[in-house]
Design a protein with these regions (language model features):
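Sec-dependent N-terminal signal peptides
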Residues: 3-12
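An acidic-aromatic substrate-binding cleft motif
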Residues: 17-38, 42-52, 428
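The substrate-binding groove and active-site-proximal loops of carbohydrate-active enzymes
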Residues: 23-34, 56-72, 126-146, 181, ...
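Conserved, mostly hydrophobic/aromatic
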Residues: 25, 45, 53, 81, ...
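Short, acidic/polar
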Residues: 32-47, 145-151, 275-286, 353-361
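Aromatic-lined substrate-binding rim segments of carbohydrate-active enzymes
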Residues: 39-46, 51-120, 149-153, 251-259, ...
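Polysaccharide-binding and catalytic clefts of secreted carbohydrate-active enzymes
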Residues: 113-309, 315
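Carbohydrate-binding surfaces of carbohydrate-active enzymes
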Residues: 301-311, 315-709
């Protein structure tokens, strides 16, 4: 192998340097593609501008017996990549455990909340066994996994094709429904008790918080088997999330120790707003562990409305906190018969064409992605996801979709300057508060109310071409104004952060019932509390938790008729000024000045209402919040169906104008400064500039990528 590597090193030297813009796909996952096509497929990929492959290095398919590794197929993949100048991301897959592990270590199988035990299964994306792995809270099997990962990194760390390692595929903890949640094995329960000791210190404190007063000692403490809005449920969810990220950190530290020179990357599913409680999806915590973050997003599963992909890209960019990120699994082929597509039109992401590939690629770039990979280079030939996602044909043949992918790949790698600039800071921030989502889950069994409130607020701004950035509550000082969706539960520490932000000059727009529930899931006897009555200059006079009756709630705020949903809260002023009313004349909104900042409290959930109803007057209201906050909008578009984004930095100023419609559009885009020249490097045309306005023609399902000078 050493002699061959010398030859391969010379052969790949011209393209062995790291790509300007990583572009490629997941290629090998043991069961696919057929071996007789490997060499041809690599040559095709290289010829068409692909510079990166990710392969699934599955523990279950490599360590065929204890300490016995079968690397043959993987060695071939690495050597073919080096020969063709393709870099490889090694996706560690200890989430597929060897069959012998399941039998030799039965205690490490996932134990669910219904007392069922998980057995080895064939994977949905690989026709191989060992899924979903075993519980790595068991130190004996984690030591086995560490032995495998160490051998993996040691074998390939000096290979010329190696780019780095992708950790914990899609950063999602499986087994997340309250009815069948993982893991309740003895090892996990012991770790949970240790976690609780760190939080409560004494048994008396735990008993008081949980309302379980007959524990003789810590060994009697067990995680809850069903959920309510109680302290024990919240503690269990927070522990599961912390435990998942403890294991991600273990992975990252292991690879850094064994191979300090290559890259550490990971990707999730942009699921922070709805899957934090169930699957530990957290863009911020994941991105903190790696050099490059990323995400899976396919329109076939999510829908092709423009705001949806943009909101995902924006979420991943926010979580990355300035680090580079990739669209690590992008769609370029159809999806057959899966439940997410049934009943939807074929044009809604179900059957992709070349223009879809172009549009979806460039939307992610407009949001700041600096790499694109597909979940398949060519489709799988078996399993429930046969024929799905890949740009190439079932036999690896070139298609119009793969030709478009090649065009984007070559273009992106020939324009180094574009990727040196980054998306500008948004007009306003939408605040992510983890406990608000967790509480929705334990109280209602789902995160829909939280997610619809957050996403509805995003849509309301987006529909006016306002760039609303997602912002973690720890980062709100970076924004002049922030919008707080669904703050039904806030911890005391969060309330203090919000108060400090406003005292220091921030502008906080909050939806209703802020901190109605706080630490340990307890409601306050008076509302608002935790000092929020002073912050908002208001006290509650009446409250209603009647979501079935409030679907079409209306209220007037600052002269606009908007909608609410789920709950309502009426107020009396306590230092603030009435800024809106319900239909009965009672106060629905209060403005206040505190320290150097201002607040606006709205007594329901207008974000969730906009998510469902899209009222034109509510759209105007959300847009008007910028003027109320004294903020000048970064970019404007006179066509509501066309979205514009601005990037600035060392690579210059770039205007991205996205047309998702099926017809060309002429749009006037307002920008924040005067320019003399607008050169479109993607559509290869010039656009008319009139000071702070650019007249842009964008072809159907296309994007203008314009250098402004």
């Amino acid at each position: 192998m050493k002699q061959l590597l010398c030859v391969l090193l010379l052969a790949g030297v011209l393209r062995a340097a790291e790509p300007v813009f990583p572009y490629g796909a997941v290629y090998f996952r043991k069961s696919n593609p057929p071996e007789e096509d490997w060499a041809r497929d690599h040559a095709t990929a290289a010829r068409m501008g692909m510079n990166m492959f990710r392969h699934w290095f599955m523990w279950a398919s490599i360590e065929v017996a204890p300490g016995k590794y079968d690397w043959r197929d993987y060695d071939r993949m690495m050597d073919l990549a080096a020969k063709n100048g393709i870099k490889v991301v090694i996706a560690e897959m200890v989430t597929a455990a060897p069959e012998w592990v399941f039998d030799k270590y039965p205690h490490a199988r996932f134990h669910a909340s219904d007392d069922s035990v998980v057995h080895s299964s064939i994977g949905g994306s690989s026709a191989t066994g060992g899924f979903p792995g075993v519980c790595l809270d068991n130190e004996d099997v984690r030591a086995l996994a560490e032995r495998f990962l160490t051998a993996l990194a040691a074998r390939y760390r000096n290979h010329p094709a190696t780019y780095g390692y992708d950790l914990w595929n899609e950063n999602s903890y499986g087994g997340g429904s309250p009815q069948k949640m993982h893991c309740y094995c003895q090892a996990t329960q012991r770790k949970f008790r240790d976690w609780l000791k760190g939080r409560y210190t004494t048994m008396d404190a735990l008993a008081s918080s949980w309302g379980r007063h007959s524990y003789p000692d810590w060994s009697y403490v067990h995680p809850p088997r069903n959920f309510g809005g109680y302290s024990e449920s919240l503690d269990w969810l927070e522990f599961r999330i912390d435990d998942a990220f403890r294991l991600l950190h273990w992975r990252s530290e292991l690879f850094r120790r064994v191979d300090p020179k290559n890259h550490i990357v990971a990707h999730g599913v942009a699921g922070t707003l709805d899957a934090l409680p169930s699957s530990a999806n957290d863009e911020w915590r994941s991105a903190a562990e790696v050099e490059t973050w990323g995400f899976t997003w396919v329109a076939s599963r999510k829908g092709s409305e423009l705001w949806k992909q943009f909101h995902a890209v924006d979420l991943v960019r926010a979580g990355s906190r300035g680090k580079p990120f990739w669209h690590a699994e992008a769609q370029a082929g159809p999806l057959w018969m899966q439940p997410q597509v049934i009943g939807r039109p074929r044009e809604d992401g179900r059957i992709s064409d070349d223009k879809d590939v172009r549009l979806w690629n460039l939307i992610s770039c407009a949001g700041g992605a600096t790499g694109i990979l597909y979940p398949r280079w060519r489709p799988l030939l078996d399993g429930p996801l046969f024929g799905a996602f890949g740009p190439y044909g079932m036999d690896g043949s070139v298609t119009p979709r793969s030709e478009m992918a090649a065009k984007v790949a070559r273009w992106a790698n020939s324009h180094t300057e574009i990727w040196k600039s980054r998306p500008v800071h948004g007009d306003i921030g939408i605040v992510f508060v983890p406990e608000s989502e967790l509480f929705a889950y334990v109280q209602q069994g789902a995160t829909a109310q939280y997610a619809e409130s957050a996403r509805g607020a995003y849509q309301a701004f987006f529909d006016s071409n306002i760039q609303a950035d997602w912002v973690h509550v720890d980062d709100i000082a970076q924004y002049k104004a922030v919008y707080l969706p669904y703050p039904l539960m806030l911890k005391a520490a969060t309330a203090a952060k919000l108060s400090k932000y406003v005292e220091n000059g921030g502008i906080l727009i909050s939806e209703g019932l802020p901190a109605y529930f706080s630490d340990h899931g307890k409601a306050g006897a008076t509302q608002p509390r935790l000092g929020l009555d002073r912050l908002f200059g208001a006290k509650e006079s009446y409250v209603e938790f009647t979501p079935d009756l409030l679907e079409n709630l209306t209220l007037e705020v600052r002269g606009s008729k908007i909608g609410g949903r789920f709950f309502l809260q009426e107020y009396e002023t306590a230092g603030g000024t009435a800024a809106g009313h319900f239909a009965n004349g009672h106060i629905a909104a209060v403005e206040n000045k505190v320290g150097n900042g201002r607040t606006l409290l709205i007594g329901s959930y207008p974000g969730a209402s906009y998510f469902r109803h899209h009222q034109p007057e509510a759209k105007k209201f959300f847009a008007g919040l910028l003027e109320w906050a004294g903020i000048t909008q970064l970019t404007t578009s006179n066509d509501a169906q066309v979205q514009a984004r601005l990037h600035t930095g060392a690579g210059g100023t770039w205007l991205w104008v996205v047309n998702p419609t099926r017809e060309p559009r002429m749009v006037t885009v307002g920008v924040g400064a005067e320019y003399r020249k607008a050169t479109d490097v993607w559509q290869e045309r010039s656009h008319r500039v009139d000071g702070r306005r650019v007249e842009v023609k964008v072809d159907d399902r296309n994007v203008a990528v314009i250098r402004l000078e």
